[in-house]
Amino acid sequence: MLKEAISEIQRGCAEIIDEPRVEKLLKAYFEKGETYTVKAGFDPTAPDLHLGHTVLLQKLAIFQKYGARVQFLIGDFTAQIGDPSGKSATRKILSTEDILENAKSYKEQVFKILDASKTDVVFNSEWLNALGASGMITLTTTFNVARMLERDDFDKRYKSGTSIAISEFLYPLLQGYDSVHLKSDIEVGGTDQKFNLLMGRHLQRSYDVGKEQAVLMVPILEGLDGVQKMSKSLGNYIGVSENPNEIFGKVLSISDELMWRYYELLSTKTLAEIERLKSGVEAGTLHPKKVKEELAIEITARFHSSESAQNAKDEFDRVHSNNQIPTEMDEFSSSEAISITKALVDCNLTPSTSQARRDIKQGAVRINQEKIDDETLSLESGEYILQVGKRKFAKLKVN
């Protein structure tokens, strides 16, 4: 059982620092029933979690299966600074209201994956606000600027003359101090967090906590484009709280090559099962679309239900294979005649009128299933089914 647990925890990890400590904690659980803590921090800088976040969350869920108590840390204090990791400029500071609203949304979403009975949701403002000026000064004496500038992102910005706020130097120290306060045994984070994660080990030594956390780093999941990391701001994401049809359709939109990456990092299938699927596709005995549909059903069911996932597949087949319109879509209304470009924006089918014009020129826009090419078209009184691309539909009533 210990070997199985270690193998499951290692799967998909980009790097593990102090793996012997991880094995020691697991062994103590299996032999003595001793629990241990695994920390992961999330700054609530946006309201929705996406599949990129779930790579880490699924790793936490595996630890819970093997005796861990998860410290799900919401960085409401550190979100006021913004994590500088990988950033080429200082991040915009969020309002307290936005941070609290986003934090509330996180709490509602994480338990689609984590076991609530084995999770402690904590906010780092609780102890960082209490740290005070004196405590903050003590914290800053544990590290120096020369070592801080060893960070690749800081080094590039410093050499290019790009501004680095003093608060950004504080960010890794504050994240590391979270591990001091929580006395975490293990911390899990993305590969872009390595400097911050190691800071936790450093500060646990500096503050004589009596332990140094092991560190597990998981890969950054590529977005739907297969190039850049999944991000809501880039529009290449699949949100945990999106409806079943959206999740299913978005998974099917990824490339065949990216599909295997998603299988490795997001699926609960064993590596042997995934390898059999891959061999079947390479041998021509399995069609890539069928294998992708299997992944789409699994991911959709995880955040909704098996029935919802199957319904999403049926709806997708009906709309895309049989060229029919969806049975359900968002409905909008206009009190007067409206231009097609404004209608597409108002119905949330495109982000801007300029993009709407491009979509029309590219032949991606249909009205009542008929392709249009006139970007000056005005929609008069009546009901319309608007479509952009293969997956975006809306019903518009013009009075």
From Swiss-Prot:
Give the highest taxon in the source lineage: Bacteria
* Keyword Ligase included in the entry's annotation: yes
List the GO biological process terms: tyrosyl-tRNA aminoacylation
Q: Where is this motif: 'KMSKS' region?
A: 229-233
Q: Where in the cell is it found?
A: Cytoplasm
Q: Which InterPro entries match?
A: aa-tRNA-synth_I_CS (IPR001412), aa-tRNA-synth_Ic (IPR002305), Rossmann-like_a/b/a_fold (IPR014729), S4_RNA-bd_sf (IPR036986), SYY-like_C (IPR054608), Tyr-tRNA-ligase (IPR002307), Tyr-tRNA-ligase_bac-type (IPR024088), Tyr-tRNA-ligase_bac_2 (IPR024108)
Catalysed reactions, semicolon-separated? tRNA(Tyr) + L-tyrosine + ATP = L-tyrosyl-tRNA(Tyr) + AMP + diphosphate + H(+)
Q: Which Gene Ontology cellular-component terms appear in the entry?
A: cytosol
Q: Which positions in this protein are listed as binding ATP?
A: 232
Q: Kindly list the GO molecular function terms attached to this UniProt entry.
A: ATP binding; RNA binding; tyrosine-tRNA ligase activity
- Looking at the Swiss-Prot or TrEMBL record, what is one Pfam family this protein matches? SYY_C-terminal
Where primarily located?
cytoplasm
User: What general EC class does the enzyme of this chain belong to?
Assistant: ligase
Chain ranges of the S4 RNA-binding domain: 338-398
Residue span of motif 'HIGH' region: 44-53
The answer to whether the entry has keyword Lyase is no
* EC annotation from Swiss-Prot or TrEMBL: 6.1.1.1
What keywords does the record list, in alphabetical order?
Aminoacyl-tRNA synthetase, ATP-binding, Cytoplasm, Ligase, Nucleotide-binding, Protein biosynthesis, RNA-binding
Record-linked NCBIfam families: tyrS
The task this protein performs is described as: Catalyzes the attachment of tyrosine to tRNA(Tyr) in a two-step reaction: tyrosine is first activated by ATP to form Tyr-AMP and then transferred to the acceptor end of tRNA(Tyr).
Identify its protein family: Belongs to the class-I aminoacyl-tRNA synthetase family. TyrS type 2 subfamily.
Complex and partners: Homodimer.
This chain belongs to which protein, by name?
Tyrosine--tRNA ligase
Q: Which gene encodes it?
A: tyrS
